[in-house]
């Protein structure tokens, strides 16, 4: 009987289920979007029951579509939007509040208050690898406990559970029998110590979070529990792989070795570098995070995020309306020889790594009477590559060694103009894989390894093939000249929203 691996890919806007075979071919895909809830400006929520309902229905749907029963499934792997926080009642399994999404800024005030505490900012950097920010789960848990009536009392009595989305899905799939997370997701909570690989007692105390709420932290590849996908008495399918979305993509790109780098070009860009067993502290405000946890050992990674990547293309389409389809950008960008001296800095929500300026705002500089639509489209596309170079330079500076290539994935990696310009700008080879579903593939690999579907990482590495490679075509002098101009444009955007 042919066996398959199912990856559940629970993202920020949709839940997906993808079936892979042993040769990593995609046998079937199902996807359902769910509601984004915006109760106030800067607040973002999801309904945890809707997350579960959409995720379970796409799992059933893809199995039916491919005519596959649970007997055919060797294991289930889970990958998920990170940091998003769910708190539920241990006895009823009902969430006490909506999921607070990673994008939600409601806990910024809590962060400001914590910044006043003696040495806490440095302690967080040193022990969790993160920066004190509303992005991470810790302050979101505190907010729920402080603001939902009766929550703190229930938590003190051990009646509430916390989990990131992976924990919630495992809890639901196992009918409330298993409460776990993996090292990668734990490393995004701001309450997990990435040195001793334990929940951090000081952070729990600072945020007033009872230890009893927290899931057990496990490897990213092991059997956590079993899901019964059919009627009672049916075959139980092992749930055997978990990783946060960006770490799953790193694993799905077979970036197993120290110095391997991947960039996911989505709405934002996420650049991760595997630093092996070395925990590298960034001097440039990059995050130190756990890349993967296997056999009780972890590999670390440096992570830098660009807030506005592919979103700049959506802006050209939806707000400026100078393109009708995202794929048009490549056509228009190649109709001009260069950017005509125009630079777009898409600091719509400030600038992330390595600038960390929340008051920066978007700018278009270098306009002349000869500037046309094509120059602006080209400059907007180029901004994605410039921001990636900024993060990559910071990474190389932090680790003290160079890299050979960048493995790429995500929607905007389909744009060949952008990929060639990226290669030109960083002076490195840019490689696209044959399977672009790297996040789901990473979760599938982790699940498959745990049940012996694939024997080891070496076997997986042999399955990884490039579909396209882009080599630099311009001189070092020229790329540095371009970049110098970009840096000048960035300076113009900094601090713009500060009150005079």
UniProtKB/Swiss-Prot annotation:
Binding site for ATP: 12-14, 267, 310, 314, 411
Single GO MF annotation: ATP binding
Signal peptide: none
GO biological process, one term: glycerol metabolic process
SUPFAM superfamilies reported for this sequence: Actin-like ATPase domain
Pathway involvement of the protein, from the record: Polyol metabolism; glycerol degradation via glycerol kinase pathway; sn-glycerol 3-phosphate from glycerol: step 1/1
Binding site for glycerol: 82-83, 135, 245-246
Substrates-to-products reaction catalysed: glycerol + ATP = sn-glycerol 3-phosphate + ADP + H(+)
Binding residue positions for ADP: 12, 16, 267, 310, 411, 415
A Pfam family of this chain: FGGY_N
Keyword Nucleotide-binding: yes
Annotated residues for binding of sn-glycerol 3-phosphate: 12, 82-83, 135, 245
Keywords associated with the record: ATP-binding, Glycerol metabolism, Kinase, Nucleotide-binding, Transferase
EC code(s) of this entry: 2.7.1.30
GO cellular component assignments: cytosol
Keyword Cell inner membrane: no
Regulation: Activated by phosphorylation and inhibited by fructose 1,6-bisphosphate (FBP).
NCBIfam families the UniProt entry points to: glycerol_kin, PRK00047.1
Quaternary structure, from the entry: Homotetramer and homodimer (in equilibrium).
Family: Belongs to the FGGY kinase family.
Function field: Key enzyme in the regulation of glycerol uptake and metabolism. Catalyzes the phosphorylation of glycerol to yield sn-glycerol 3-phosphate.
Name of the protein in question: Glycerol kinase
Organism per entry: Clostridium perfringens (strain 13 / Type A)
